[in-house]
Design a protein with these regions (language model features):
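Conserved SF1/SF2 helicase motif Ia
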Residues: 2-26
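Conserved catalytic network of the ASCE P-loop NTPase/AAA+ motor domain
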Residues: 10-13, 51-54, 72-75, 97-101, ...
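Short glycine-/polar-rich loops that comprise or flank the Walker A/P-loop
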Residues: 13-15, 40-41, 77-78, 101-104, ...
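Conserved nucleotide-binding/hydrolysis micro-motifs of P-loop NTPases
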Residues: 24-26, 64-67, 87-88, 103, ...
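Inter-Walker segment of RecA-like/P-loop motor cores
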Residues: 34-72
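SF2 helicase catalytic motif II
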Residues: 73-107, 111-112
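Interdomain helical connector at the RecA1-RecA2 junction of SF1/SF2 helicase-like NTPases
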Residues: 118-181
Length: 181
């Protein structure tokens, strides 16, 4: 996402980029990464000062955060929208974002192709449930970008038998009560 944004800004194909994600933690990670690899003015929706919005070239927002302020922007304000975690039910809940802005739209997901919603493929113009690009787990392992995984199953007495008050110490009971459990 960052490399594509930088490439398109440097080539003057886009002036402003909107990067959307589904959680504040991802918004923070994205802001740090964009700051590390680009020198473009950045605006983090819900975090940056409103005065910083005017000069920003890259905007980072959660889906709900952008929904709250999207009507402050003209439909042509962004030239590129990158939607992280685009496999989630974004079309049903946040589809208006993608319908409102007249911009090139890129959807990113790590979800296997057969688990992505048909409406998500349609939203990004990928008919027939065929993504524009796909990098499978198997390919990533073969290219040494990921290591093979092994599923390890563990269990605990609590998972097998449940929590029984009579087996807990007074300190454990107090701790659970303080946690609202």
């Amino acid at each position: 996402a960052i490399a594509l944004s930088k490439l398109m800004i440097d080539a003057r194909w886009v002036k402003r980029v909107l990067f959307l994600c589904d959680r504040k933690e991802l918004r923070k990670q994205a802001a740090n990464a964009f700051n590390q690899f680009t020198n473009e003015p950045l605006y983090v929706v819900g975090k940056s000062k409103k005065a910083d919005r005017q000069n920003a070239r890259i905007y980072i927002a959660t889906y709900p955060g952008m929904m709250k302020i999207m009507d402050h922007f003209d439909v042509g304000y962004f030239d590129l929208i990158i939607a992280d975690e685009s496999h989630r039910s974004i079309y049903n809940v946040y589809g208006d974002l993608f319908k409102y802005f007249d911009a090139l739209q890129i959807g990113l997901t790590a979800t296997p192709i057969d688990m992505v919603s048909k409406t998500t493929f349609g939203l990004f113009g990928c008919e027939g449930r065929i993504p524009t690009a796909n990098y499978s787990l198997e390919d990533a392992i073969a290219d040494n970008n990921l290591v093979p995984y092994e599923v390890v199953t563990h269990t605990t007495e609590f998972l097998r038998e449940g929590i029984k008050r009579e087996k807990l110490s007074d300190a454990q009971i107090r701790e659970l009560e303080e946690q609202g459990i």
